Design a protein with these regions (language model features):
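Amide-donor transfer/coupling interface in amidating biosynthetic enzymes
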Residues: 1-20, 45-160
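Catalytic nucleophile loop
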Residues: 13-41
Length: 160
C-alpha cells in the first residue's frame, strides 16, 4: 500500500524527533530501518539463497520456529533477561544494510537481522518476529510489551 508507506516513512522520523517510544514489529522493523536510511532485502530466498520456509511459518503463529540470538548488553538482553529467544517468523523481506543510527542487536541462526535499536535512545527498538503471538505463553515476548508500555507511560508523564 503506497499511501501507508508514505505515511509511515513520514511519521517515524517525527516520532523519533519528539523522543516518543517506537516499537516496530515485523514490517515495523523494516519501515523503521528504511525511514532512518537503511535498505532491505526484498526477497530472502532469491537474494540470499536462504529458504524462506524458515521465515514463513504456517499457523499456529504462536509456535516458535527458530532462535534469535541477542547481543550481550543489548537493550533486548536488558529487557528480556536472556541472550537467546525462541521466536516465530513470518516474513520474506528483511534488513539488508542497517541505518547508521541503528544498532543490530539480534540475528536468526541464518544471519538474518531480527532485532535492532536506536544508538542514541533506548526508546526506539524493533523486532522482525511477532511477539504478539507469543506473549500469552512466553514471558520474554511479554517483557517486550511491558517495556514498551513503561516507556509510553514515562513519555506521557514527561508531557504533563
Amino acid at each position: 500500500d503506497p499511501q501507508r508507506d508514505i505515511f509511515e516513512l513520514l511519521i517515524i522520523p517525527m516520532a523519533i524527533a519528539r523522543n516518543m517510544p517506537v516499537f516496530g514489529i515485523c514490517r515495523g522493523i523494516q519501515v523503521l530501518n528504511v525511514a532512518m536510511g537503511g535498505t532491505l532485502i526484498q526477497d530472502i530466498e532469491s537474494q540470499k539463497g536462504i529458504p524462506t520456509k524458515m521465515h514463513q511459518q504456517e499457523p499456529p503463529y504462536g509456535a516458535p520456529v527458530h532462535t534469535v540470538r541477542f547481543e550481550r548488553g543489548s537493550i533486548f538482553e536488558r529487557i528480556t533477561g536472556v541472550t537467546e529467544m525462541q521466536t516465530n517468523s513470518m516474513h520474506h523481506q528483511s534488513i539488508k544494510e542497517p541505518a547508521s543510527r541503528l544498532r543490530v542487536d539480534g540475528y536468526a541462526e541464518d544471519g538474518i537481522i531480527e532485532a535492532v535499536s536506536a544508538k542514541d535512545t533506548d526508546r526506539v527498538f524493533a523486532v522482525q518476529f511477532h511477539p504478539e503471538y507469543l506473549s500469552d505463553h512466553d514471558v520474554y515476548a511479554q517483557r517486550l510489551f511491558d517495556h514498551f508500555v513503561k516507556l509510553s507511560r514515562d513519555y506521557q508523564n514527561e508531557k504533563k
